[in-house]
Amino acid sequence: MDSGGWIVYCCIFFILLGKVLEYTSSYQDKWFTKLTLTPEARKLNSQYHELLSERLRLQEENHSISAQDNYARWTKNNRKLGELDKKLGTIRDKLQETNTSSKKVFGRVKLIGLTIPFWILKIWQRSHVVYHFPKQDLFPKLVTGVWARGWLYLALGPLQYLRNGSLNIQDYAPHGVSLGIWIWALQATINTLEFLVKQVILEKPVSPPPQKSKSATKAETKRPEKLEITDDKVELD
């Protein structure tokens, strides 16, 4: 690895941080609710939990009493439950608006702090050599050019061949794997490992449909078909 190892470490940090944010996407709503610093959102959250506990209490009370023996009390509780449902719906909508604004802020922070710096680093240091080749002719010229200059070399290779008559790699010294190709290979490896883990470990195997026994199959084949009369007309020759 070249002396500029900080570039590689920064790329690994950006990739791992992006994966952590991807894996924890289902928990981010709870984090947004807990990390909201506005006093209005905290007040709405406390009101929501108070009303929710009151609603649960009234439901338990209605289940414990009889509607025939305590009709007035049961009707009063039902009326309160309807009012609580409306209040809970209003507060829930306000909390969702707050969470939506928090998600927008988080998306901007992620864009400014993760996506843009990683993109700038990849463009700025795309020709940085991560691994050097021990020999110049270790691989074919086309492969060496792609690893040294990225996939753009593969696209411009035919033009270079038509202009010079050969694929010149002499200007690609020292020969090795560039940062752009190394990042592409690392991300492809991580995605492949994720796919294998999901398919082999996380996802449950699909069991085949149950097969009918031979005796049941024979019984179905031997069972006579029932004929139904759908018309009462009789035709005479």
From Swiss-Prot:
Main localization of the protein described in the UniProt heading: endoplasmic reticulum
Metal-binding listed as a keyword: no
Lumenal compartment spans: 1-4, 132-176
Coiled-coil annotated spans: 40-99
Region entry Disordered, spans: 205-237
Compositionally biased spans, kind Basic and acidic residues: 217-237
Annotated Gene Ontology cellular component terms: endoplasmic reticulum membrane; GET complex; Golgi membrane
Residues in the Cytoplasmic compartment per record: 25-110, 194-237
Pfam name, any one: CHD5
UniProt entry tagged with the keyword Transport: yes
Subunit structure: Component of the Golgi to ER traffic (GET) complex, which is composed of GET1, GET2 and GET3. Within the complex, GET1 and GET2 form a heterotetramer which is stabilized by phosphatidylinositol binding and which binds to the GET3 homodimer.
Name the record gives this protein: Golgi to ER traffic protein 1
Organism: Zygosaccharomyces rouxii (strain ATCC 2623 / CBS 732 / NBRC 1130 / NCYC 568 / NRRL Y-229)
